Design a protein with these regions (language model features):
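Short, charged beta->alpha transition segments
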Residues: 55-65, 103-115, 138
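Short beta-alpha connecting loops at secondary-structure transitions
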Residues: 277-288
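An N-cap/entry alpha-helix motif that binds or orients negatively charged groups
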Residues: 2-68, 313-314, 320-327
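Alpha/beta enzyme core
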Residues: 92-93, 97, 118, 130-249, ...
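Active-site cofactor/substrate anionic-group-binding motifs, chiefly glycine-
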Residues: 63-107
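Short FAD-binding loop at a beta-strand-to-alpha-helix junction that anchors the flavin cofactor
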Residues: 69-75, 249-251, 269-271
Length: 327
């Protein structure tokens, strides 16, 4: 089977095998209860086919003043220990070649510059550092380097959860008051994203503070074990603020059918993280591009089968919930 015809699961499997060869085994071994519940909920959602009167499908969208070919983006990602020196840039190139963007988490200046040099659309997500001057420094750097948007992980206000048990980085990260966050948002000309929103209340607060977008996210289970699963939190959030800012989502999405369900529930775009890391390990930037292309192809097929010509046409009217599938 050629690389071009590889499925999403085959790309990820090849990535795992390549990581094993360098001594990295059992990548992403633990799945938090909130992510398991999110998976069960996604698997309980089915779509209604509408096969007569076929439509030509367009998966493109406008986001952060960009025309993207796909609503599938790379969630905020940081350099992992086993990545090569070009790993971050390779992900960025793969995302750009697939017609999408990359969000960056913690990166050093060299990695950041390498990503920028690929020409990929870049979103810089900063951490809620207790030393707020570092926040401003990173925002200024993002602006000067041509990022298309910036943002902050509010779900790290109280540190990072490692392996579901160990809390770390509480000395480095800390909660930002609403006044502090409002000031931070006001200091950048770029669209500001609040990442880690899991309630309508926080979504409304983000809007009031001047955010242009939010990411409904549990940080790949790196924040809380039992927070509301992102897909279950999404409808109330969309109902509350969906017509006023861009609502994005991530955490536990695996394929184009998952993306379709996220869009049907009101998200404008869907982020992937773990799968992209595996695709990078499989075939470098080409693996990332192949992964995003395959996910987008899956999405396009379901759109065609449900009579949805473009992304705005996807809504909950094509979704049927089958609760017994969650048992």
């Amino acid at each position: 089977m050629t690389e071009e015809s590889s499925t999403v699961s085959e790309i990820c499997a090849r990535g795992r095998e390549n990581l094993k060869k360098i001594g990295v085994d059992g990548l992403f071994p633990r799945i938090a209860p909130t992510v398991k519940a999110n998976r069960q909920y996604l698997d309980s959602l089915f779509y209604e086919t509408r096969l007569f009167n076929p439509v030509d499908v367009d998966t493109s969208l406008n986001l952060f003043n960009l025309k993207l070919r796909t609503p599938v983006f790379c969630s905020a990602i940081s350099r992992l220990p086993y990545m090569s020196e070009t790993g971050m840039a390779d992900i960025a190139k793969g995302m750009a070649d697939a017609g999408s963007l990359i969000m960056l988490g913690i990166v050093n200046s060299a990695d950041f510059q390498a990503v920028i040099d690929t020409g990929a659309p870049v979103v810089r997500i900063v951490k809620p550092f207790r030393k707020t001057e570092r926040i401003y420094d990173e925002l200024r750097e993002a602006e000067s380097q041509g990022c298309v948007a910036v943002g902050m992980d509010i779900d790290h206000f109280h540190g990072v959860l490692m392996g579901g048990e160990r809390v770390r980085a509480t000395g480095q990260f800390g909660p930002q008051s609403t006044e502090e966050l409002k000031q931070i948002i006001s200091q950048t000309k770029l669209p500001f994203i609040v990442k880690g929103v899991l309630s309508a209340r926080d979504a409304e607060q983000a809007l009031a503070l001047g955010a242009s977008a939010i990411v409904v996210s549990n940080h790949a289970s790196g924040s809380f074990n039992f927070s509301v699963p992102s897909m279950m939190a999404l409808p109330k959030i969309v109902q509350s603020v969906g017509d006023k800012l861009n609502v994005l989502i991530d955490t536990g999405f695996e394929n184009g059918e998952d993306v379709f369900k996220g869009l049907a529930f009101g998200a404008k775009a869907v982020g992937f993280g773990s799968s992209i890391v595996l695709a990078l390990a499989a075939d470098g930037s080409r693996g990332v591009e192949l992964l995003i292309n395959q996910i987008t192809a899956q999405l396009a097929r379901i759109m065609a089968a449900t009579g949805c010509a473009d992304l705005p046409a996807i809504d909950k009217s094509v979704i049927a919930e089958i609760p017994f599938m969650r048992q």
